Amino acid sequence: QNPLNFVNNFSDVNKELLSELKEEIKKGNYGEVQSIAKDVIDNEEKINCHGKRADSIVKGMLQHSRASSGQKELTDINALTDEYLRLAYHGLRAKDKSFNAEIKTEFDSSLGKINVVPQDIGRVILNLINNAFYAVGEKEKENLNAYQPTVIVRTKRNNGKVEISVIDNGNGIPDSIREKIFQPFFTTKPTGQGTGLGLSLAYDIVKAHGGEVKVQSKEGEGSEFIVQLPVNA
């Protein structure tokens, strides 16, 4: 959901609670006053949290609008994918020194160059790889025996299209939410950790290139996101 809806809803609730608070103070019901005050504080924390999420969404959208030149150019997809894979890994390691995963690359050397907006497709790759790292990192926290976090990044040519696949052996995506993952503001991450715009923007970017994003997932075993781009865009 749009985090501003939460901000508005909790603000409305607090207005009512504060009216009740005034009445209870007049009556001298200080036990009830304490209870209402606690509810108001709890709601303020939620407002603060969702407000920060809204802020990060706006910043992300502004960053995206500034970063994209909109100019397509012949781009080496293997080199671009490798560059953003390294960026994702080192960016995460800078924030979390304990993160570790086996990373495998399977690049099709015959891929050649295709016409894309490199910053935009790079943003898509970065988002998918960050999501894969998050998925395996969360599964590793479960301390399962012999679990080895693994992310595979693969490129290949398939039926006149270039495919970029990001595969993880995390917990997969439940069937109940698979249809929602490309919706704006939808996120499975804890409040404050995800904007819910990453996959939505990725979907729009790929669609603007005449391509599509597909997902295959098995709950408990992992997910594969496949970006398909036309060779002659």
Question: Where are these predicted regions, by residue range?
Answer:
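Short helix N-cap motif at coil->helix boundaries in the Bergerat
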Residues: 77, 172-180, 194
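Conserved catalytic submotifs in the C-terminal HATPase_c
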Residues: 98-112
